Structures are given as structure tokens and as C-alpha cells.
Amino acid sequence: VCMIEPSISAVARLLESTEKGHLPTVIVDIGPASTDIAILDGSIRVTGGLSIGGNTFTLDIAKKLHIPLENAHQLKVINGLSPGSRQQKLVKALSPSLEHIIKETQKVMRYYDERVDGHRKLEQVLIVGGGANIPGIGEHFTNALVMPARVASPWQHLNFGTLQQPAKQFRPRYITVAGLACVPPKELVA
């Protein structure tokens, strides 16, 4: 049995059924090496992407603060963008890469608004992927895009049976896999 599709399609399938995906939604999937962006409005209407991901954030912090990669990763996932004593330095380190993602997201949104016939007003931004595991990233996107944004959390809507859910800090990584697991059996090729 086989199913091949772009990862953003699997993400969209999951979010459409669990995260108010019936609303016109911007999906920002921040993977380790790249970010995929999609507009979901009944189906995927527009996509975009760039070669900046969670690993880029870690490298940015390590370079800017002159610390080892392991320490940079810890600062990223523990402190991130939320208020605190170290945040100014972290925000300054992360800002250039985050700004590139914001600009590409705005470009995709603008294309949807200007070129897609019958489009509806975009209602929300859902951030997924391992790179979404940064405290304060939802608020950062909300402020930058002037639209409600948050890290997607579809887990409460999924039936794991006897399997244990992934640990909270790893959940954003499994969004694509969970979306693939939601493929109706009739769509699979034997």
C-alpha cells in the first residue's frame, strides 16, 4: 500500500479536520532545513517556500551569541521569543531569518488575495513543524502579520488507540506523519 504526496498536503489534510481548517487558513510548516507555506481554503490554493528552517534558527543563535550549537538549540526551544532576560539577544539573532519567513508568508497571502478567484478573507495562521517548537513564535507571527497565529495542536482530536501520544516538545515534528495517517483507505494504492 502506498501514498505519495507533498508534505504540505498531508499537513493540510490533518489541520482541515482538526484545527478549524474550514476557515481560510495560512499554514506555515517550519521544517529543519526549509519552510513551506500554503493557503488552505477548502483545498490548497497557493503555496510557497524558502530554504530557512529550524536548523537555520539554531545556527543564527550560535553565530550571534558565539555559543556551541547544542547551547543555541537549548536557548531556542526553552527561551525562544517569549519575554525574559535573554530575549533581546535571541530575538535579534532570530529576526533576520524570521523576517524572511514573514515576508514570504506575506507574498503568498498577497498572491492569494490578488489572484485567486472567489477567495475568502484569511482568518488564521497555523504554524507547524519542528521549527514551530519555539516559545512565543505564535505571538511573533500574530504581531508581524496582524492576524491570529498559533502553533497548531491537533493531537486532542486524534485517536491513538493504545499508542502513547508523542511528547509535547516533539509533537510539531509529527504533523506530516499524522496527516498521512488520516488518508482514507480508498485513496491508497495497493
Regions inferred by a protein language model and the residue ranges of each:
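Hydrophobic/aromatic-enriched cytosolic interaction surfaces used to assemble or bind macromolecules
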Residues: 1-190
